Amino acid sequence: IGSVREPATSLGINVGTGGQISARTDEFHFIPGLENRPFPEGHYLLIGGGLFGGRSYAYLLSVFQQVDAQLFDGAGRDDLYDRMTGLAATIPAGSDGLRCAPFFTGSRVDPGLRASFTGLSPDNFTPGHFARALLEGMAEGFYRFGEQMAPVIGPRTTHVGAGNGVRRNRLLAAILAARFGAPLRLPALA
């Protein structure tokens, strides 16, 4: 069903405007901060839903567009997402110490939570570092949901990526794979 061929052994990671990770379980499990949804044949889908998907990357894009408009009279480019990702790809994993908690609109558990960038230094105060740190922060958020699920779902041998946020941003897919320590499968139609 959906993007996951082997639901009993897979972890689905879907990044669109928001994002979620999901895993099929054989019974209902209450884990604070996670949701259970019905799944065919008497199973359940355990969901970690974040408000930090592609919309978070769009907020950073908006900042860069405002800088362009306000400082450079709007000489901007149409491929700014690609430029951001290209710059982020030149930055080493860990963003030279810059960290992002991408909770611009809170979380499902704490709607008042807000985003932050920490570890700023003269060396990492660049557009590429901000873009990379934000993508790494998104991956970290999904990974934390996975940690919450782990006692119930056990190890999952397959990680499946879905949604435009993963399909169109291969750097994000690579960062997710690195954070989860497993290859991320990207189905053609997911």
Which stretches of residues belong to each language-model region?
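Active-site core segments that coordinate phosphate-bearing ligands/cofactors
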Residues: 1-160, 165-190
